[in-house]
Amino acid sequence: SMRKNNYGYHAESFVCDYLEAEGYQIVKRNYIADGGEADIIAVLDEYVCFVEIKYRTNGSGLEAAIDTKKQKRIIKSAEQYMRKTGCRLQPRFDAAYVSSYNGEDLSLEYILNAFDASGV
């Protein structure tokens, strides 16, 4: 729905603002790969971070963790990104849990190393 997409866009910008404030450089948003995608790709120090945004509304606890199928898609996008750009940084897979209580005020819980490539 338009509302969902609009919320998604705001949430994504909100996460990017947070990352930039923490010193990350945003290199891609909505990276689409063959058989995969990544919401945000950001660089900090020796890490290139592939960030998955998860939404929750009305403080409904942590949504289901990022399932294995989704992890595979993110890892696939990471592999392609690394190959295409020749990026030599250490890949890291993070999750950004965005909550909204009224569709306006967003809050963020940011998880470093939410998963790694070994389990899939």
Region roles according to the model:
Residues 1-29:
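Acidic-basic catalytic patches of nuclease active cores, encompassing PD-(D/E)XK
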Residues 31-33, 55, 97:
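Short, glycine/acidic-enriched loop or turn micro-motifs at the edges of active sites
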Residues 38-59, 74:
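Conserved catalytic cores of phosphodiester-cleaving nucleases, focusing on short active-site segments
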Residues 23, 34-38, 91:
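Short beta-strand or tight-loop elements
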Residues 84-120:
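Domain-level recognition of nuclease-like catalytic cores that cleave nucleotide substrates
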Residues 56-78:
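Mg2+/Mn2+-dependent nuclease catalytic core
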Residues 35, 46-50, 90, 108:
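Structural motif
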Residues 2, 6, 10, 35, ...:
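Residues at secondary-structure transition points
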